[in-house]
Amino acid sequence: MAIIQSGGAAGTALLIDPTFAAARVAMRPVDTLGWNSVGAATGNVSALVINNTAFSFRNFASNPIIVRRVGVGFITTTAFTAPQQISFGLLVARSFTASDSGGTAIAFTGNNCKHRTSLGTPTSIDCRIASTTALTSGTRVVDANTVAMQAGWSGVAGTTIAPGLNNLLGHDAGDYPIILQQNEGLLIVNLTAMGAGGSGITYIAAEFAEASAF
């Protein structure tokens, strides 16, 4: 068994397996101030048009936000007069000067949505999901292209897009996550206009961490 020691610290720093010449390491999360997950649902929405916002997340703080997962789903509660596609996109919004408004605000206060009680509470975030109508857009610069999209076919009432934890964004160890600096955020927007007669509920899931630096 080979041992690698740090020149600046006593004791064993790294073990090397002699059979496979592989390092023995323990994977751990990145160093963060706090780690949170959230799941939420809209009200029963209808008549959404293209680029209506279903979910908005803005980082007010100077600390960066590391986004690990984002997911979306849609359940058709009342069938549309004509069967149609339902689709959503994940967009990065930059240079916020006014947050989106309306809908239901999601507060990350106290221990709400923490992965561990002893972790810090997010410094300053505006997070909200649409109610029975779309959110009202604030002032921000939205990227021209989506980071990801999800779509499904709505022919009858039922599952159109199966709700997922990471079907819009999934960050694995070693990948570079989405980093939201101060006054940057993420939006989940409707990409296909909803036709007559139908309605449904949108579900979102997100996982993120606040760090002192990244």
Question: Where is each model-derived feature located?
Answer:
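Intrinsic-disorder/low-complexity loop/linker signature
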Residues: 1, 18-21, 103, 121, ...
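N-terminal compositionally biased, intrinsically disordered segments and leader/signal-like regions
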Residues: 13, 43, 98, 133-134, ...
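Extended, solvent-exposed segments with strong compositional bias
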Residues: 114-178
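A broad, low-specificity signal for short, low-complexity segments enriched in glycine/proline
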Residues: 18, 26-32, 49-53, 145-149, ...
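Intrinsically disordered, low-complexity segments enriched in polar/charged residues with Gly/Pro
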Residues: 1, 43, 163-166
